[in-house]
UniProtKB/Swiss-Prot annotation:
Keyword Secreted found: yes
Any one GO MF annotation of this record: neuropeptide hormone activity
Subcellular locations according to the entry: Secreted
Gene Ontology biological-process entries: autonomic nervous system development; energy reserve metabolic process; fat cell differentiation; feeding behavior; G protein-coupled receptor signaling pathway; lipid metabolic process; reduction of food intake in response to dietary excess; regulation of multicellular organism growth
Pfam families, A to Z: Prolactin_RP (PF15172)
Job description of the protein: Stimulates prolactin (PRL) release and regulates the expression of prolactin through its receptor GPR10. May stimulate lactotrophs directly to secrete PRL.
Source organism of this protein record: Homo sapiens
Keywords: Amidation, Cleavage on pair of basic residues, Hormone, Secreted, Signal
GO CC annotations, alphabetized: cytoplasm; extracellular region
UniProt KW Acetylation keyword: no
UniProt protein name: Prolactin-releasing peptide
Designated gene of the protein: PRLH
Length: 87
């Protein structure tokens, strides 16, 4: 019984210590950004700095053309199954 009480007392003290330590930690603001960091430095090394420097707009090559249909990436069904386009 004494071992159980000692164990619970240790758990209680550990919980209080961790709770107190968490309240004293310094929380950094995500809005503080260092202006001397250059996103081109990362991009020239093949690193995409999307999270740090904001979202990049899609380039014109990435936008699908309105007249072209997207390619379907399906495999033909084996057996006697007919597709809905065959009628």
């Amino acid at each position: 019984m004494k071992v159980l009480r000692a164990w619970l007392l240790c758990l209680l003290m550990l919980g209080l210590a961790l709770r107190g330590a968490a309240s004293r930690t310094h929380r950094h603001s995500m809005e503080i950004r260092t202006p001397d960091i250059n996103p081109a430095w990362y991009a020239s090394r093949g690193i995409r700095p999307v999270g740090r420097f904001g979202r990049r707009r899609a380039t014109l090559g990435d936008v699908p053309k309105p007249g072209l249909r997207p390619r379907l990436t399906c495999f033909p069904l084996e057996g006697g199954a007919m597709s809905s386009q065959d009628g």
